[in-house]
Amino acid sequence: MSVEDLKATVTKLQDRISYLEQKAGVVPNVPKSVRMVLIGPPGAGKGTQAPNLKEKYCACHLATGDMLRAQVAAKSALGVEAKKIMDQGGLVSDEIMVNMIKSELENNKECSNGFILDGFPRTIPQAEKLDSMLETRKTPLENAVELKIDDELLVARITGRLVHPASGRSYHKLFNPPKKDMIDDVSGDALVQRSDDNEDALKKRLVTYHKQTEPIVDYYRKTGIWSGVDASQKPGKVWDDILKCLGQK
């Protein structure tokens, strides 16, 4: 018997054992883990797709803006330090942001089967610091998925965007409306329209995004974990394409 034959036999045995254990209720049917960065401009659909990824992979969704606000509200050591900097008009350092992510990975039970990072990294130094921290933990990134879409379409999309602040779920007045006007489908909470979701503010954010993000995309291309998805498609098709990128289709 060749080495390849042995490997095939072992794989079949492992699959059979897993099946029998699950059937007997010995272990839960835990999905494949995920360790990824979701990249995309404001309005590309990260707020639509990230909750889907979280649910499918039983992983945590780390939207760094929300995470920062939560740490400040909780008055954690990192949150207090970050608030002091923000109150002085400064930018929170890369070290603080990476340590916040590290704290979530170590203390948030939802992160035990992986994580979806959203909104970080935005610069090459941030990407390098993140990689260093994750490699030290032996949980390196496996995928960097970019949601690609033309700026003109984004303007049409984002000016009708509605958000559920607590979960990050997002809707659109025309393209993806909630079942009840201005009400979140899942929780029944009121939806809000962000103050910076207007055309002028968006165009400024897009200039910053392109300037920051193009080098990040190149960085992940070079590491071999980047893949791109056409985010101008309907959400269901975008979801299918993301799963293909993650080897699930």
UniProtKB/Swiss-Prot annotation:
Q: What is its EC number?
A: 2.7.4.3
List every stretch annotated NMP. Answer: 63-92
Binding site residues for AMP: T64, R69, G90, L91, V92, G119, F120, P121, R122, Q126, R194, R205
> Which leading EC class covers this enzyme?
transferase
**GO MF, one example:** DNA replication origin binding
Q: Which PROSITE patterns match?
A: ADENYLATE_KINASE (PS00113)
Identify the keywords attached in UniProt to this record, alphabetized. ATP-binding, Cytoplasm, Kinase, Mitochondrion, Nucleotide-binding, Transferase
Q: Where does ATP bind?
A: G43, A44, G45, K46, G47, T48, R161, S170, Y171, Q233
| Region annotated LID, chain positions | 160-197
Q: Membrane-crossing residues?
A: none
Keyword Transit peptide belongs to the record: no
> Where is it localised?
Cytoplasm, Cytosol; Mitochondrion intermembrane space
GO CC term, one of those recorded: cytosol
Q: Name one GO biological process term.
A: ATP metabolic process
Q: Spell out the Pfam families in the cross-references.
A: ADK (PF00406), ADK_lid (PF05191)
Annotated catalysed reactions: AMP + ATP = 2 ADP
Q: Which PANTHER family match?
A: NUCLEOTIDE KINASE
- Which protein family is named in the record? Belongs to the adenylate kinase family. AK2 subfamily.
Q: What does this protein do?
A: Catalyzes the reversible transfer of the terminal phosphate group between ATP and AMP. Plays an important role in cellular energy homeostasis and in adenine nucleotide metabolism. Adenylate kinase activity is critical for regulation of the phosphate utilization and the AMP de novo biosynthesis pathways.
Q: What is known of its domains?
A: Consists of three domains, a large central CORE domain and two small peripheral domains, NMPbind and LID, which undergo movements during catalysis. The LID domain closes over the site of phosphoryl transfer upon ATP binding. Assembling and dissambling the active center during each catalytic cycle provides an effective means to prevent ATP hydrolysis.
Quaternary state and partners of this protein? Answer: Monomer.
Question: What is this protein called in UniProt?
Answer: Adenylate kinase
Q: List the source organism.
A: Debaryomyces hansenii (strain ATCC 36239 / CBS 767 / BCRC 21394 / JCM 1990 / NBRC 0083 / IGC 2968)
